[in-house]
Amino acid sequence: MTTIFRLASSSSPSLRHDATPHNFHIRKTSISNTFSFSSKNSLSFKRILTSGGSRRFIVAASPPTEDAVVATEPLTKQDLIDYLASGCKTKDKWRIGTEHEKFGFELGSLRPMKYEQISELLNGIAERFDWDKVMEGDNIIGLKQGKQSISLEPGGQFELSGAPLETLHQTCAEVNSHLYQVKAVAEEMGIGFLGIGFQPKWERKDIPMMPKGRYEIMKKYMPKVGSLGLDMMFRTCTVQVNLDFSSEADMIRKFRAGLALQPIATALFANSPFTDGKPNGFVSMRSHIWTDTDKDRTGMLPFVFDDSFGFEQYVDFALDVPMYFVYRKKKYIDCTGMTFRDFLAGKLPCIPGELPTLNDWENHLTTIFPEVRLKRYLEMRGADGGPWRRLCALPAFWVGILYDEVSLQRVLDMTADWTLEEREMLRNKVTVTGLKTPFRDGLLKHVAEEVLELAKDGLERRGFKESGFLNAVAEVVRTGVTPAERLLELYHGKWEQSVDHVFDELLY
């Protein structure tokens, strides 16, 4: 059989934010495929794979070099710019891609799931619900079905990366179907799942590490660049939405609106007030952790608000973000501290003389972690994980604002005179004070009221009857009380200062 692949997966906002290369090496099926990528430099790529076997297949996490995309001429900076620009699509092709993570735990002991249990769970879901297994060596590390994938974060956080869908009704149905499947298998194993932004009870030493090569490299590097990076890896969960743009100008508008409003999203979804079994002084510990993870690859990207900003400026930024690794001969090679700019010039000491492929570039882009991230779509990354209604509300909030021209323009007008210092202040303070954060002559709550109205109006103008998905956050805006503050009320009240009750309260 012959399959034509588009380069490195569809550019719709569907696939992983981790650095698993997308030109998957597929076994147990016979494949002969050829694909090409057109740019101003007319790069062409070719790959042939053949092997016999049955129709069901296993997808390996990353391609061996010999099966990887090989460029017929060296990549240029323009190719990297063109790669981002290739995400532009007409409005009728805009989609919604939602990702969420959750903590698995033993229902009896509340202890985190071990890898052996996760492996059993993944195999169970694959067999019962017809998913294809994603392997790294002999270890199962994820599942794929159509354009959906399930993957593992470093501490075993269980992630669904949804397919690119047209409406929020489809998105919420996808989340419900996933939670049903996971629950069906997990309950038989005595496993539950928790929707929260930060591991509330267990210390970092209690969290098992998943057998993925890239995480070994990150684990060694993180303590060199920040004090909280390991907590980010092992103890946080998020929900994010990935959205399309029509042009460079549209990308810039959405990027700026997304960054300006990200602290409001952080406050609305703040849901991580406990660490090591006690209140931690934050409403979003998860968001705070990103402020001391790695300054080179995180933050509010002030340059996005420069008049000169565009695809090229993001490429310049990404070229100078230190790399984590390259993947060659079925192994992750540690390239920490070196830059993609060095790689482009063939000057990586870890693989002397080698030049990057677009696959390497795609992987590198996924190791950058700002509050809004650009790939061939935009990722809104400011929200804590939470219960299923909020998993549907987060994409609803951003779709209502960014996919409606009127609401988007109103947000841009509203935030146009916000200074860099104000945006940074909001980003840092909402993690503690949520919607009660003072802003200008009022509270952030007052801005959030206006923004939620714009999101609702934007959804109504879309005409799909989607505004009901905002109900899960409407109460937060009305009262100014974040989900985290509700949990703290319970902790100091009927839970009698025992965090164990949160595993029941936020059980999926």
Swiss-Prot record:
InterPro entries, A to Z: GCL_bact_plant, GCS2, Gln_synth/guanido_kin_cat_dom, Glut_cys_lig_pln_type
Reaction catalysed by this enzyme: L-cysteine + L-glutamate + ATP = gamma-L-glutamyl-L-cysteine + ADP + phosphate + H(+)
Matches recorded under Gene3D superfamilies: 3.30.590.20
Protein name: Glutamate--cysteine ligase, chloroplastic
EC number: 6.3.2.2
Transit peptide region: 1-59
UniProt subunit comment: Homodimer or monomer when oxidized or reduced, respectively.
Biological pathway: Sulfur metabolism; glutathione biosynthesis; glutathione from L-cysteine and L-glutamate: step 1/2
Keywords: ATP-binding, Chloroplast, Disulfide bond, Glutathione biosynthesis, Ligase, Nucleotide-binding, Plastid, Transit peptide
Signal peptide boundaries: none
Residue pairs linked by disulfide bridges in the UniProt entry: C172-C392, C335-C350
GO MF: ATP binding; glutamate-cysteine ligase activity
Organism: Medicago truncatula
Compartments it resides in: Plastid, Chloroplast
Record bears the keyword Transit peptide: yes
UniProt keyword annotation of Transit peptide present: yes
Lineage: Eukaryota, Viridiplantae, Streptophyta, Embryophyta, Tracheophyta
Post-translational modification: The Cys-172-Cys-392 disulfide bridge is known to modulate the enzyme activity according to the redox status. The oxidized form constitutes the active enzyme.
GO biological process: glutathione biosynthetic process
One of the record's GO cellular component terms: chloroplast
Family: Belongs to the carboxylate-amine ligase family. Glutamate--cysteine ligase type 2 subfamily.
